[in-house]
Structure formats: structure tokens, C-alpha cells
Regions:
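Short amphipathic alpha-helix that is part of the acyltransferase structural core
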Residues: 1-16, 104-138, 242-243
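A general structural signal for short secondary-structure boundary/capping elements
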Residues: 86, 110, 136-141, 201
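Acyl-donor-binding surface of acyltransferase catalytic domains
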Residues: 44-107, 190-243
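A mid-sequence, solvent-exposed acidic-amphipathic segment
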Residues: 132-171
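Short beta-strand micro-motifs in enzyme catalytic cores
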Residues: 9-11, 33-35, 89-93, 154-156, ...
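Conserved donor-binding loop and adjoining core beta-sheet/short helix segment
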Residues: 1-55, 159-190
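Residues that form generic nucleotide/phosphate-binding pockets
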Residues: 125, 129, 147-150, 221
Length: 243
């Protein structure tokens, strides 16, 4: 028999009156649809996973979310056996010129900074892109201003006529966020961006979420990458809340 004993936001987990660990439920104020779960179980036994997550879903009254490194095989097996689904893989990439396989490009790059008109356009473009590509994982629920507050102050971008078609928010050698209106124009932009940055920096770094086509296209321009990732698992069994 599985029982949970609550202390504030922490739950002690008992199986047949024996403590097998604890877990914590918490919120991310920027992504409020899902309830985040931090598991600290001594024995992630797949025999109790379905019962445990069904009970947590009742308590939270919304989908559950767990973040885990992709090399944590035992924990991942526990999540999958209980009904979680992997919704996102996030790859951390750090590369140099020797890793680049994208070839030459001649997209015309422009630069703007916070406070300029094109910077505001780039912010709105990125916000729409982020909201669309991440809504199936855990939608952004904070306001637009909060989103912009976390962005770097420098943008590299390209235009077709008067329209901005590709954007990269950058900070020194880090490409923090990218987006574009279509894959073809963004691919040309990304190659030019990378070649330009690698002329200035020995390495560049960025994160690529597999739910974000632009970030994954950027990742595809390089070889010799580490394939471990930081993964997002979601449990969204609404039937679990019925009694």
C-alpha cells in the first residue's frame, strides 16, 4: 500500500509503512500550467509509479512535470512506467570552427540594441515563436514584459525588404535565442551568424530544444556533439483526477 504524508510542499512516501523517499511539488511562475515534481526516492520502483503519479495528479489538479538528465536511466524508466511522456530534450552545445559543417553563407547581417525599434520587433517575433514552439510542453503564462526582461540586449538579424525574417539574441559568444519566419531564410542566416561569430570567438555556445525547429537547425550545422540532454517529462492523465 502506498501512502503520502505531507509537510508544507514536501511529501514523504511510504510503501507498506516503510519510508522510501520524498518528493516536492513546486511552481514555475513563468509556466503555470504544469505542477513541477522533484523526486528523491530511495527506490524508484516501477511497481508503484502508476499509483504514485495518479495520486499526485489528484493533489495537483493539473499536469505534472519532471526535469531529468537523459543519462538517468532508472529514473526515466520509473517515469515512463507511470505514464509520463518525454515532451522536450534540451541539448547544451559548445562548438568551435573545427566542428562547423554548414559551409559558407552570404546573408546580410544587421545589429540592434535594446531601446531601438528593430529590437522591439525582434522581441515580439521571438515571443510569438517561443509561445508556439513550447506550448505543447508547458506554455508561457507570464506576461510579455517578463519575457523580454530576460533577453540579452544585443540582437543580430536579417531582413527581406523592410521585414525582419531571422533573429538571434546574443551575449558575447552565447547565442541565447533564435527564431525565423521560415526554414530556408533562417538556414542562410544561421550559417552567416555562425561564421561571423567564430571569426571573433574561439567557441560559441547555445541550447537547442528539440521542440524548437530554429534552434535544432542551428544545432545541425555542427558535428562532434554530445548527445546527452536535459529532458522534460509530462504526466497529463486527466482521468487520474476522477474519483
Amino acid at each position: 500500500m502506498l501512502t503520502l504524508q505531507r509537510t508544507d510542499d514536501t511529501y514523504i512516501v511510504y510503501r507498506d509503512d516503510r519510508c522510501i523517499g520524498s518528493l516536492r511539488l513546486y511552481d514555475n511562475p513563468h509556466h503555470m500550467r504544469n505542477c513541477y515534481v522533484k523526486l528523491e526516492l530511495d527506490e524508484p520502483d516501477t511497481g508503484i509509479s502508476a499509483e504514485l503519479f495518479k495520486e499526485l495528479r489528484k493533489i495537483a489538479e493539473r499536469p505534472l512535470q519532471v526535469m531529468v538528465d537523459s543519462d538517468k536511466a532508472e529514473l526515466i524508466a520509473f517515469l515512463l512506467s507511470g505514464g509520463f511522456v518525454c515532451r522536450r530534450k534540451c541539448y547544451e552545445v559548445e562548438v568551435g570552427i573545427e566542428d562547423y559543417i554548414g559551409g559558407q553563407a552570404d546573408a546580410q547581417l544587421e545589429h540592434c540594441r535594446i531601446g531601438e525599434a528593430d529590437y522591439e520587433k525582434a522581441c515580439r517575433m521571438l515571443f510569438a515563436h517561443y509561445a508556439e514552439t513550447h506550448k505543447a510542453v508547458n506554455p508561457w503564462t507570464a506576461d510579455y514584459g517578463t519575457f523580454c526582461d530576460a533577453l540579452p540586449e544585443d540582437v543580430i538579424y536579417s531582413k527581406q525588404g523592410a521585414e525582419i525574417v531571422s533573429v538571434a539574441f546574443v551575449e558575447e559568444n552565447e547565442i541565447a535565442y533564435v527564431c525565423g519566419v521560415d526554414k530556408n531564410s533562417f538556414a542562410e542566416f544561421a550559417r552567416s551568424l555562425v561564421c561571423t561569430m567564430l571569426e571573433k570567438y574561439e567557441t560559441i555556445c547555445f541550447e537547442s530544444d528539440d521542440c524548437d525547429w530554429a534552434a535544432m537547425l542551428l544545432k545541425s550545422l555542427f558535428k562532434n556533439q554530445e548527445e546527452t540532454s536535459y529532458d522534460t517529462y509530462v504526466y497529463d492523465n486527466e482521468a487520474a483526477i476522477s474519483r
